[in-house]
Amino acid sequence: MEKMSRQLPLNPTFIPPPYGVLRSLLENPLKLPLHPEDAFSKEKDKGKKLDDESSSPTVPQSAFLGPTLWDKTLPYDGDTFQLEYMDLEEFLSENGIPPSPSQHDHSPHPPGLQPASSTAPSVMDLSSRATAPLHPGIPSPNCMQSPIRPGQLLPANRNTPSPIDPDTIQVPVGYEPDPADLALSSIPGQEMFDPRKRKFSEEELKPQPMIKKARKVFIPDDLKDDKYWARRRKNNMAAKRSRDARRLKENQIAIRASFLEKENSALRQEVADLRKELGKCKNILAKYEARHGPL
């Protein structure tokens, strides 16, 4: 009863304005003094707390006074449930959770001045955990929206080798044709014949039939006029050109065949070396699989 009848001293800064006492009370609330017993008990509790903290290791406590995360319940509706974007750093700062417990215990800097390099791994770990579904029976939206395909596992920028033109491949062949043979295989006044580049068509490589000479027709001397001799000279020149062209083609084919024989032997030797190297690689691979299992 004595406590009820005691008058409380008013705040000296409190001046009730003329426009309303209720509004002034809301804006400037009264500050009640503490009772001596309450103040003494609070001082006692504070000293006890300090002794406990000095004797026991420090335990990180949250300064957030609101409800904790695990006390919150999310309303779930199968049709309207959606995951929204959340800033992870803001979420951690709101709930008073340090980025990593090791930094909270050993770092001399305050949480707001911690270097970004030390918090990066823990933030990545927490972000990977945050993408997990909230309920075990509900798959995450990333799995529902973008299923993983087998083709996506391969890198996008694969270095695929460009196709090689077989004509551009130069096989090292120790072949030096005779200059006299090259002269016989080349047309006078034109480029020298090159057996490495010259190719013949299938029609040119077909065997040619033997040409039989026509039967000689006896013509008396009194009929051998100027017209006869002009026709005779013309036929002889055509026959000579035909023989020269045929001989030139035969010489070119012979030199080309000689070069191809040399190239073929060089390629055979190269294939033999490659097969030998392939056999060694297969033996090494077989030993590795026998020791460490199949690849």
Curated annotation (Swiss-Prot):
Gene3D superfamilies in the record: 1.20.5.170
Swiss-Prot/TrEMBL induction comment: Accumulates according to a robust circadian rhythm. Displays only a moderate amplitude in the liver (1.6-fold) and none in the brain.
A GO term, aspect molecular function: DNA-binding transcription activator activity, RNA polymerase II-specific
GO cellular component: nucleoplasm; RNA polymerase II transcription regulator complex
Protein's organism: Mus musculus
Statement: the UniProt record of this protein carries the keyword Transcription regulation: yes
Residue numbers spanned by region Leucine-zipper: 248-255
Keywords tagged on the record: Biological rhythms, DNA-binding, Nucleus, Transcription, Transcription regulation
Pfam families, per database record: bZIP_2 (PF07716)
Residue ranges constituting the bZIP domain according to the UniProt record: 225-288
Similarity section: Belongs to the bZIP family. PAR subfamily.
Region (Basic motif): 227-247
GO BP of this protein: rhythmic process; skeletal muscle cell differentiation
CDD domains assigned to the protein according to its UniProt record, in alphabetical order: bZIP_HLF
Intracellular or extracellular location(s): Nucleus
Basic and acidic residues biased stretches: 36-52
Native organism taxonomy: Eukaryota, Metazoa, Chordata, Craniata, Vertebrata
Disulfide bonds, paired cysteine numbers: none
InterPro entries: bZIP, bZIP_sf, PAR_bZIP
The encoding gene: Hlf
Top-level taxon of origin: Eukaryota
Note: Mice deficient for all three PAR bZIP proteins (DBP, HLF and TEF) display a dramatically shortened life span and are highly susceptible to generalized spontaneous and audiogenic epilepsies (due for example to the noise of a vacuum cleaner) that are frequently lethal. The down-regulation of pyridoxal kinase (Pdxk) expression in these mice may participate in this seizure phenotype.
Main subcellular location of this protein, as a coarse class: nucleus
Quaternary assembly: Binds DNA specifically as homodimer or heterodimer with other PAR factors.
Identification of the protein by name: Hepatic leukemia factor
